[in-house]
Amino acid sequence: MRTQSLKPYHANYHSLTTNDSPTRVDAPTDSGLISEFVYSENQPVVTQLLLPLLQQLSKQSRWLLWLTPQQKLSRSWLKQSGLPINKVVQLRQINPLSTVEAMEKALLTGNYSVVLGWLPELTEDDRIRLRLAAKLGNAYGFVMRPLNDTKVGSGQCATLKIHSYLYH
Protein backbone atom coordinates (compact mmCIF):
# COMPACT_ATOMS: atom_id res chain seq x y z
CA MET A 1 0.00 0.00 0.00
CA ARG A 2 1.19 3.53 -0.71
CA THR A 3 0.44 7.02 0.47
CA GLN A 4 -0.65 9.52 -2.17
CA SER A 5 -1.19 13.27 -2.19
CA LEU A 6 -4.74 14.51 -2.55
CA LYS A 7 -3.90 17.55 -4.67
CA PRO A 8 -7.10 18.80 -6.31
CA TYR A 9 -5.64 18.67 -9.82
CA HIS A 10 -7.80 17.25 -12.57
CA ALA A 11 -6.91 17.31 -16.25
CA ASN A 12 -10.41 18.44 -17.25
CA TYR A 13 -10.84 20.82 -14.31
CA HIS A 14 -8.87 23.65 -15.96
CA SER A 15 -11.13 23.72 -19.00
CA LEU A 16 -14.14 24.13 -16.72
CA THR A 17 -12.69 27.05 -14.76
CA THR A 18 -11.42 29.31 -17.54
CA ASN A 19 -13.40 32.20 -19.01
CA ASP A 20 -13.25 30.68 -22.49
CA SER A 21 -16.40 29.54 -24.18
CA PRO A 22 -17.62 26.15 -22.96
CA THR A 23 -15.66 23.28 -24.42
CA ARG A 24 -16.28 19.58 -24.44
CA VAL A 25 -14.78 17.81 -21.44
CA ASP A 26 -12.76 14.71 -22.37
CA ALA A 27 -14.48 12.45 -19.85
CA PRO A 28 -17.96 11.24 -20.84
CA THR A 29 -20.70 13.33 -19.26
CA ASP A 30 -22.32 10.21 -17.74
CA SER A 31 -19.08 9.09 -16.06
CA GLY A 32 -18.61 8.74 -12.34
CA LEU A 33 -21.10 7.92 -9.67
CA ILE A 34 -21.66 7.99 -5.93
CA SER A 35 -23.41 5.18 -4.06
CA GLU A 36 -24.12 4.83 -0.38
CA PHE A 37 -23.87 1.49 1.40
CA VAL A 38 -25.43 1.12 4.83
CA TYR A 39 -24.21 -2.16 6.24
CA SER A 40 -24.57 -4.38 9.29
CA GLU A 41 -22.12 -6.85 10.81
CA ASN A 42 -24.75 -9.58 10.41
CA GLN A 43 -24.95 -9.55 6.60
CA PRO A 44 -21.94 -10.24 4.30
CA VAL A 45 -23.75 -9.28 1.08
CA VAL A 46 -21.88 -6.01 0.43
CA THR A 47 -18.56 -7.82 0.35
CA GLN A 48 -20.01 -10.24 -2.19
CA LEU A 49 -21.38 -7.38 -4.30
CA LEU A 50 -18.60 -4.85 -3.89
CA LEU A 51 -15.54 -7.09 -4.23
CA PRO A 52 -16.10 -8.05 -7.92
CA LEU A 53 -16.52 -4.37 -8.80
CA LEU A 54 -13.34 -3.44 -6.91
CA GLN A 55 -11.47 -6.25 -8.68
CA GLN A 56 -12.65 -4.94 -12.05
CA LEU A 57 -11.78 -1.33 -11.21
CA SER A 58 -8.32 -2.40 -10.02
CA LYS A 59 -7.52 -3.36 -13.63
CA GLN A 60 -7.46 0.34 -14.53
CA SER A 61 -4.19 2.23 -14.28
CA ARG A 62 -5.58 4.32 -11.43
CA TRP A 63 -5.52 3.83 -7.65
CA LEU A 64 -8.14 2.49 -5.24
CA LEU A 65 -8.48 4.82 -2.23
CA TRP A 66 -9.89 3.78 1.14
CA LEU A 67 -10.72 6.68 3.44
CA THR A 68 -11.17 4.64 6.60
CA PRO A 69 -11.18 6.59 9.82
CA GLN A 70 -11.34 3.49 12.04
CA GLN A 71 -10.60 0.42 9.91
CA LYS A 72 -7.18 -0.84 8.88
CA LEU A 73 -6.88 -2.89 5.70
CA SER A 74 -5.19 -6.24 5.99
CA ARG A 75 -2.52 -7.06 3.38
CA SER A 76 -3.49 -10.73 3.56
CA TRP A 77 -7.15 -9.88 2.90
CA LEU A 78 -6.17 -7.73 -0.09
CA LYS A 79 -4.14 -10.63 -1.53
CA GLN A 80 -6.89 -13.19 -0.87
CA SER A 81 -9.44 -10.86 -2.45
CA GLY A 82 -7.42 -10.43 -5.62
CA LEU A 83 -6.87 -6.70 -5.10
CA PRO A 84 -3.43 -5.35 -6.05
CA ILE A 85 -1.61 -4.14 -2.95
CA ASN A 86 0.48 -1.78 -5.08
CA LYS A 87 -2.66 0.10 -6.25
CA VAL A 88 -4.38 0.45 -2.88
CA VAL A 89 -4.00 3.68 -0.93
CA GLN A 90 -5.39 3.94 2.58
CA LEU A 91 -5.78 7.09 4.67
CA ARG A 92 -6.62 6.45 8.31
CA GLN A 93 -7.40 8.54 11.38
CA ILE A 94 -9.29 11.20 9.43
CA ASN A 95 -11.90 13.24 11.27
CA PRO A 96 -15.27 12.03 9.87
CA LEU A 97 -16.27 15.62 9.03
CA SER A 98 -13.04 16.08 7.05
CA THR A 99 -13.59 12.79 5.23
CA VAL A 100 -16.30 14.30 3.00
CA GLU A 101 -13.87 17.01 1.87
CA ALA A 102 -11.04 14.49 1.43
CA MET A 103 -13.33 12.23 -0.61
CA GLU A 104 -14.41 15.14 -2.81
CA LYS A 105 -10.79 16.18 -3.47
CA ALA A 106 -9.73 12.60 -4.20
CA LEU A 107 -12.59 12.08 -6.66
CA LEU A 108 -11.78 15.36 -8.43
CA THR A 109 -8.15 14.41 -9.05
CA GLY A 110 -9.02 11.66 -11.51
CA ASN A 111 -6.19 9.60 -9.97
CA TYR A 112 -8.54 7.04 -8.41
CA SER A 113 -10.88 4.59 -10.11
CA VAL A 114 -12.76 4.24 -6.82
CA VAL A 115 -12.83 6.05 -3.49
CA LEU A 116 -14.43 4.34 -0.51
CA GLY A 117 -15.17 6.61 2.42
CA TRP A 118 -16.61 5.76 5.82
CA LEU A 119 -18.78 8.80 6.43
CA PRO A 120 -21.56 9.97 8.73
CA GLU A 121 -24.99 10.75 7.31
CA LEU A 122 -24.57 13.02 4.26
CA THR A 123 -26.39 16.27 3.69
CA GLU A 124 -27.93 16.92 0.29
CA ASP A 125 -25.16 19.48 -0.37
CA ASP A 126 -22.53 16.81 0.41
CA ARG A 127 -24.20 14.40 -2.03
CA ILE A 128 -24.26 17.02 -4.78
CA ARG A 129 -20.58 17.91 -4.22
CA LEU A 130 -19.54 14.25 -4.26
CA ARG A 131 -21.62 13.45 -7.38
CA LEU A 132 -20.04 16.37 -9.25
CA ALA A 133 -16.55 15.40 -8.12
CA ALA A 134 -17.10 11.78 -9.19
CA LYS A 135 -18.39 12.92 -12.56
CA LEU A 136 -15.47 15.29 -13.16
CA GLY A 137 -12.92 12.72 -11.98
CA ASN A 138 -14.61 9.87 -13.88
CA ALA A 139 -14.53 7.82 -10.68
CA TYR A 140 -16.75 5.72 -8.46
CA GLY A 141 -17.35 6.89 -4.91
CA PHE A 142 -18.76 4.54 -2.31
CA VAL A 143 -19.99 6.06 0.92
CA MET A 144 -19.84 3.35 3.57
CA ARG A 145 -21.97 3.75 6.69
CA PRO A 146 -22.18 1.11 9.40
CA LEU A 147 -25.66 0.61 10.80
CA ASN A 148 -26.20 0.44 14.53
CA ASP A 149 -27.33 -3.21 14.85
CA THR A 150 -29.82 -2.39 17.61
CA LYS A 151 -32.01 -0.64 15.03
CA VAL A 152 -32.41 -3.77 12.90
CA GLY A 153 -34.73 -5.42 15.42
CA SER A 154 -36.95 -2.34 15.64
CA GLY A 155 -38.40 -2.49 12.15
CA GLN A 156 -35.56 -1.06 10.08
CA CYS A 157 -35.04 -2.37 6.56
CA ALA A 158 -32.53 -5.14 6.02
CA THR A 159 -29.15 -3.74 5.08
CA LEU A 160 -25.92 -4.90 3.53
CA LYS A 161 -22.64 -5.29 5.39
CA ILE A 162 -18.91 -5.62 5.07
CA HIS A 163 -17.37 -7.72 7.82
CA SER A 164 -15.02 -5.56 9.84
CA TYR A 165 -12.59 -8.46 10.37
CA LEU A 166 -11.62 -8.06 6.72
CA TYR A 167 -9.96 -4.75 7.52
CA HIS A 168 -7.89 -5.72 10.57
Swiss-Prot record:
The record marks 168 as: Essential for degradation by Lon protease. Residues 161-168 are annotated as: Lon protease binding. The keyword Repeat does not apply. The keyword Phosphoprotein does not apply. Coiled coil: none annotated. NCBIfam families: PRK10595.1 (NF007892), SOS_SulA_coli (TIGR00623). Belongs to the SulA family. Component of the SOS system and an inhibitor of cell division. Accumulation of SulA causes rapid cessation of cell division and the appearance of long, non-septate filaments. In the presence of GTP, binds a polymerization-competent form of FtsZ in a 1:1 ratio, thus inhibiting FtsZ polymerization and therefore preventing it from participating in the assembly of the Z ring. This mechanism prevents the premature segregation of damaged DNA to daughter cells during cell division. Interacts with FtsZ. This is Cell division inhibitor SulA. It comes from Yersinia pestis.
